[in-house]
Amino acid sequence: MSFHYRKEVISPEVLQELYSLTPEQKAQKEIRDAQIRAIITGESDKFLLIIGPCSADHEDSVCEYITRLAKMQEKVEEKILIVPRIYTNKPRTTGEGYKGIVHQPDPEKAPDFMEGLIAMRKMHLRAISETGLFSADEMLYPENWPYISDILSYVAVGARSVEDQQHRMTVSGMNVPAGMKNPTSGDFSVMLNSCIAAQSSHTFLYRGHEVTTDGNPLAHTILRGAVNKHGQNIPNYHYEDLERLHEKYSLLNLHNPACIVDANHSNSGKKHYEQPRIVDEVLHSRLVNPAIAELVKGVMVESYLLPGSQKVNEHEYGKSITDPCLGWDETERLIDKIASHL
């Protein structure tokens, strides 16, 4: 019943030096970050689509998927800004199962955090090099932020992490948009309180230092559905939910009121095929209510090369080994449909 220190891992400074952005990529990122920021602040009316596999399990299939996304981005660039999901850390409800490439660079082998941190950064960089798109990742471990702080354009804080003080304070030091999900209980006030905390300045301990942050005015909400005391999924993407969130925002003095709707998780009951229908309903709510249109900046969708999911040892290329995802054909149709409705 104690910690067993196995080995020291690579530092963020060394990892960034070994695998770094080129000057051209840094310039591209500044442009992309400004475009995403403009959507969150309301300066741009483009629609934000954060889309990709539930978990970024294999570099080749993930990068092939993002290459296809990049072609779709060219097609819909006048209306939609696509941010690929490269989720390298996965929260697990019971602690069991694949926890992401940072834990296990090979899903069938034992955890290796040294290799996992390297694999995480290499995957993000390869996606940037091959597509010019800059990605989103979930901040499961606040101490990992410096390893990818220079390459991410969007961060999500999950339903189980959003109440944690260290997550909130770490977001307050970021310079990119951060989506704070509603907790699994569905409580809007918890989600909004996390935005208040993330938009505020804090002084705290972080990676061996006392640090002070400026606050992140781009922190915003993500609606992902809820689970009641009986374990039943309770969606919160409906018109009434969006209207209620707008009302709650109006009572607070938050910067840049904004919401992303997560079309999977408890909103779909993890029925991946429901995601297009959910997105369609969100788009309709935006169409009939200008206040909702102003608040809801985009959606989050889980998709991959092949539909559904599989066990870790089944080895079907481009198919999720965690939650079920849309396949590419459905993804392409969904992106086209979103563009046609905007």
Residue ranges of each PLM-predicted region?
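N- or domain-start disorder-to-order transition segments that initiate the globular core
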Residues: 1-41
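Conserved phosphate/anionic-ligand binding catalytic regions in large, soluble enzymes, centered on
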Residues: 48-61, 323
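Acidic (Asp/Glu)-rich catalytic clusters
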Residues: 40-43, 70-77, 126-130, 213, ...
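N-terminal beta-rich core of secreted/periplasmic extracellular enzymes
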Residues: 25-42, 72-83, 89, 120
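Short acidic, Gly/Ser-rich segments with clustered Asp/Glu that frequently serve as metal-coordination loops
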Residues: 54-57, 256, 264-270
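Conserved, mostly hydrophobic/aromatic
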Residues: 52, 261, 327
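Active-site-facing alpha/beta catalytic cores
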Residues: 66, 79-244, 265-271, 275-281, ...
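Internal helix-turn-beta structural module
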Residues: 304-342
